[in-house]
């Protein structure tokens, strides 16, 4: 299995490759792989196509012809049971036999020559399989019309499907090839195959597939199993990991004799199925154990991944918080620096403080938000914006503030607004020569 996986095959393709090899008996792994690849790894069509490899039959893919792919029929341990036709009895019987013998020889010789010559003129239509399931279903309908509904349960599918199901279910598969032109076929179907005891025995012990050798699907199976006479039965099972013919029953066999022969074949080969069933259970248990280990590993892996994810998420969150704090700090520092530069610029732009004896002097005492007092002289003719710029230039002054008179209490319009585009002068604002003003902090607002 490891060697196959090294060839670049998936587990599903490896299983199909081994199953195809079991069904067809091909020894070459490379040949099996090539055939499956030609059929896009469809094992059913691959088996059907390989069974089509008979002389004069076109294949789906035009590849180099190889030996026909068949179920293993060369096992030297295969059990074979042939029922010969009864010998003539008495003088009358022998006389009739000797009289008819030349006619039989002549008839079958001419028939064989005719069929042989016909092959050169027109290929055997049975060699072209176009609807294998239809061939099987058609035979079942004709069988029931002629022999009734009491019969073993027919497998309604192709031969390769029956092989595959028998392998998967570890069951025996009994294959019946019906020779419509054979003199014993009608007797076998009526008096052996359709009896209640044979029907019950087959239904309870095995799968049953049947088709007429005159149908393309039946003819193809006939070419694979190489029957010598009719009625023909073949018992197939999974043996040594290959679908193998373990029993062949040919001739007009009686009901009880058929049951006895099938029982003998089953008992002689049951150990192979038991062994395969134990091996399969062991493989299933190993697979279940491996699956449980894989699931446990996946659970552990997911837990580790979740742990790693949370750890990374926490690290990312911490990094984002640090970056955000650093960004805010930089913004705060830049804002502080810009504020200091603005204060310095306002301070440089302030008009000089008037002398104490100037007639338009206004002495203003500012009470700061921190409780300290600041005193400065201004002129009545100066704008209230000069007062605002002076206070703004002071280090202890907050970034945002307003100037309020004590009585009557009012906010001085020191900055331009929609209502007052140009701030008034100190005189227009009604300030006296000595004035107390309050500076209110608006930073939090």
Swiss-Prot record:
Keywords: Coiled coil, Cytoplasm, Endoplasmic reticulum, Lipid droplet. GO terms for molecular function: protein-macromolecule adaptor activity; ubiquitin binding. Gene3D superfamilies: DNA helicase RuvA subunit, C-terminal domain (1.10.8.10), Glutaredoxin (3.40.30.10), Phosphatidylinositol 3-kinase Catalytic Subunit, Chain A, domain 1 (3.10.20.90). It is found in: Cytoplasm; Lipid droplet; Endoplasmic reticulum. GO terms for biological process: ERAD pathway; stress granule disassembly. Residues 12-48 form the UBA domain. Residues 275-353 form a coiled coil. PROSITE patterns: UBX. InterPro entries: FAF1_2-like_UAS, Thioredoxin-like_sf, UAS, UBA-like_sf, UBA_8, Ubiquitin-like_domsf, UBX_dom, UBX_domain-protein. Plays an important role in endoplasmic reticulum-associated degradation (ERAD) that mediates ubiquitin-dependent degradation of misfolded endoplasmic reticulum proteins. Involved in inhibition of lipid droplet degradation. Involved in stress granule disassembly. This is FAS-associated factor 2-B. It comes from Xenopus laevis (African clawed frog).
């Amino acid at each position: 299995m490891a060697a196959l996986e090294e060839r670049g095959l998936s587990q599903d393709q490896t299983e199909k490759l081994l199953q195809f090899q079991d069904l067809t008996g091909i020894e070459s792994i490379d040949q099996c792989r090539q055939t499956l690849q030609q059929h896009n790894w469809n094992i059913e069509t691959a088996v059907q196509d390989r069974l089509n490899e008979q002389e004069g039959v076109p294949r789906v893919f035009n590849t180099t012809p190889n030996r026909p792919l068949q179920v293993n029929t060369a096992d030297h341990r295969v059990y074979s049971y042939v029922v010969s036709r009864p010998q003539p009895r008495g003088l009358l019987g022998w006389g009739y036999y000797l009289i008819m013998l030349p006619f039989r020889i002549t008839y079958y010789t001419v028939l064989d020559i005719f069929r042989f010559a016909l092959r050169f003129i027109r290929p055997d239509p049975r060699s072209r399989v176009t609807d294998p399931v239809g061939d099987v279903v058609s035979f079942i309908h004709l069988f029931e019309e002629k022999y009734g509904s009491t019969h073993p349960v027919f497998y309604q599918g192709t031969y390769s499907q029956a092989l595959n199901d028998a392998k998967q279910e570890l069951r025996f598969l009994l294959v019946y090839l019906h020779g419509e032109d054979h003199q014993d076929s009608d007797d076998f179907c009526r008096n052996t195959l359709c009896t209640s005891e044979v029907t019950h025995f087959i239904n309870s012990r095995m799968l049953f597939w049947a088709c007429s050798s005159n149908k393309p699907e039946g003819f193809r199976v006939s070419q694979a199993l190489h029957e010598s006479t009719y009625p023909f039965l073949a018992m197939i099972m999974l043996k040594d990991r290959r679908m193998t013919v373990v029993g062949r029953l040919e001739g007009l066999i009686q009901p009880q004799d058929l049951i006895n022969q099938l029982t003998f074949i089953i008992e002689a080969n049951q150990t192979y199925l038991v062994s395969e069933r134990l091996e399969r259970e062991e493989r299933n248990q190993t697979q279940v154990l491996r699956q449980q280990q894989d699931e446990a590993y996946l659970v552990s892996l997911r837990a580790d991944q979740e742990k790693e994810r949370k750890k990374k998420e926490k690290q990312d969150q911490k990094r984002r918080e640090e970056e955000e704090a650093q960004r805010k700090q930089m913004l705060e520092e830049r804002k502080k620096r810009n504020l200091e530069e603005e204060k310095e610029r306002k301070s440089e732009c302030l008009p000089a403080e008037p002398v104490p004896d100037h007639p338009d002097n206004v002495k203003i005492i500012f009470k700061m938000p921190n409780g300290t007092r600041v005193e400065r002289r201004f002129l009545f003719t100066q704008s209230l914006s000069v007062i605002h710029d002076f206070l703004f230039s002071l280090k202890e002054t907050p970034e945002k503030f307003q100037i309020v008179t004590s009585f009557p209490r009012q906010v001085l319009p020191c900055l331009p607004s929609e209502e007052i585009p140009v701030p008034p002068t100190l005189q227009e604002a009604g300030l006296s020569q000595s004035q107390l003003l309050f500076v209110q902090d608006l930073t939090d607002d």
